[in-house]
Curated annotation (Swiss-Prot):
The gene is COQ6. This is Ubiquinone biosynthesis monooxygenase COQ6, mitochondrial. InterPro entries: FAD-bd, FAD/NAD-bd_sf, Ubi_Hdrlase_CS, UbiH/COQ6, UbiH/COQ6_monooxygenase, UbQ_mOase_COQ6. It comes from Homo sapiens. NCBIfam families: COQ6 (TIGR01989), Ubi-OHases (TIGR01988). One of its GO terms (molecular function) is oxidoreductase activity, acting on paired donors, with incorporation or reduction of molecular oxygen, NAD(P)H as one donor, and incorporation of one atom of oxygen.
């Protein structure tokens, strides 16, 4: 149930299928509600990390923070030998954020897998691009979501004097401030929970997912559409132990398939394909599923002589202009079996909020943007939001400013929209460009991939952008 928008002068219900109706009117009056400096609505990875970032900020030592999580507290007493099928690719920038408040140490003491190279290639041609670093720095880390959540929970428990966490608590109503000319004089946000309890906050941060109740309540428009794809995830056992420090991604005509390292013998699968094919993959027997995965990575059945010849000609021309070592295509490790019950699917889509902030409101993570998993940037975009917003709020707290003032919230919005919009557009373009086997488009992307792979500075810029 989406939270309903209420004016201070009485409840205003939205008409069927309309956006929230707002009755702005000046209000004044006393209240005995508990007041928090910041309330974070949504206690998933991004919401919990946002609460941690503020809870450990030196300029927030005298602030009160509330984290609302609709689900129960997740306790990870000990690691299971079986890996979870829900993992995230953590960029170096995100690892730095997690390190800033101590969560990364917990992750390192539990389990994660670093990868130092990434190979991306086309199923319809020989075109590929290889990302690696000469100094052998880690390009990223594959971490189970449960491990990240455990680390964040531990760190939240250590600052319980600053951060209050309410589990099984969901906001059902927000009472919004009137849009006064001066944000500093604007009333605070009133929040009503399902059990009837109420709070006030100087700043409400929406981290409540792509169906964000905060975003809907404040009336921020969201541009979104569903893709004609679902993602199948699973935990795979390799045929033999390997160093397994490469992330593999192949663009099939039906969608990208990725193999992400978990250990010497295990990898995580993310296969984006049509809804019908995804349902088949989840329901087929193990042997057929394993054969389908290996074929998706190894088969050249979608190649054509015309595309291969044209690609070879460009590769030859590039070698004449730049006679350096060219990346040779490598094959990923073969898969032997799949963990029982690890296969699940979820639908894919794109979304982007027209605004990230309003007076006393900020959106982060999936509440502000939703992206296709082919870029592996979903949670990293959310962590990037946290780094930016926490910086602006810390500066405001240091200077004694109102945390809910748009004067510094818009700085966060400008920074993150510039970054996120570019990434969303590029990801959507790649999804559409690689979802076809039409020869002209295959040739275009083949030449584009080969040219990009040949220009080292361009590859370095791409890696730098993705690592933030």
């Amino acid at each position: 149930m989406a939270a309903r928008l209420v004016s201070r002068c009485g409840a205003v219900r939205a008409a069927p299928h309309s956006g929230p109706l707002v009755s702005w009117r000046r209000w004044s009056g006393a209240s005995t509600d508990t007041v928090y400096d910041v309330v974070v609505s949504g206690g998933g990875l991004v919401g919990a990390a946002m609460a941690c970032a503020l809870g450990y900020d030196i300029h927030f030592h005298d602030k009160k923070i509330l984290l609302l999580e609709a689900g129960p507290k997740k306790v990870l007493e000990k690691l299971s030998e079986t890996y979870s099928n829900r993992v995230s690719s953590i960029s170096p920038g995100s690892a730095t954020l997690l390190s800033s408040f101590g969560a990364w140490d917990h992750i390192c003491n539990m389990r994660y897998r670093a990868f130092r190279r990434m190979q991306v290639w086309d199923a319809c041609s020989e075109a590929l691009i290889m990302f690696d670093k000469d100094n052998l720095d880690d390009m990223g880390y594959i971490v189970e979501n449960d491990v990240i959540m455990h680390a964040l929970t531990k760190q939240l428990e250590a600052v319980s004097d600053r951060v209050t966490v309410l589990y099984r608590s969901k906001a059902i109503r927000y009472t919004w401030p009137c849009p006064f000319p001066m944000a500093d004089s604007s009333p605070w946000v009133h929040i009503t929970l399902g059990d009837g309890s109420t709070f006030q906050t100087k700043l409400l941060i929406g981290a409540d997912g792509h169906n964000s109740g905060v975003r809907q309540a404040v009336g921020i428009q969201n541009v979104s559409w569903n893709y004609d794809q679902s993602a199948v995830v699973a935990t795979l056992h390799l045929s033999e132990a390997t160093e397994n420090n490469v992330a593999w991604q192949r663009f099939l005509p039906s969608g990208p398939i990725a193999l992400l390292p978990l250990s010497d013998t295990l990898s995580s699968l993310v296969w984006s394909t049509s809804h019908e094919h995804a349902a088949e993959l989840v329901s087929m027997d193990e042997e057929k599923f394993v054969d389908a995965v290996n074929s998706a990575f190894w088969s050249d059945a979608d190649h054509t002589d015309f595309i291969d010849t044209a690609g070879a000609m460009l590769q030859y021309a590039v070698s004449l202009l730049k006679p350096t070592k060219v990346s040779a295509r490598q094959l990923p490790p073969s898969v032997a079996r799949v963990d029982a019950k690890s296969r699940v699917l979820f639908p894919l889509g794109l979304g982007h909020a027209a605004e990230y902030v309003r007076p006393r409101v900020a959106l982060i993570g999936d509440a502000a943007h939703r992206v296709h998993p082919l870029a592996g940037q979903g949670v990293n975009m959310g962590f990037g939001d946290i780094s930016s917003l926490a910086h602006h709020l810390s500066t405001a707290a240091f200077n004694g400013k109102d945390l809910g003032s748009v004067s510094h919230l818009t700085g966060y919005e400008t920074e993150r929209q510039r970054h996120n919009t570019a990434l969303l557009a590029a990801t959507d373009l790649l999804k559409r460009l690689y979802s076809t086997s039409a020869s002209p488009l295959v040739l275009l992307r083949t030449w584009g991939l080969q040219a990009t792979n040949a220009v080292s500075p361009l590859k370095e810029q791409i890696m730098a952008f993705a690592s933030k």
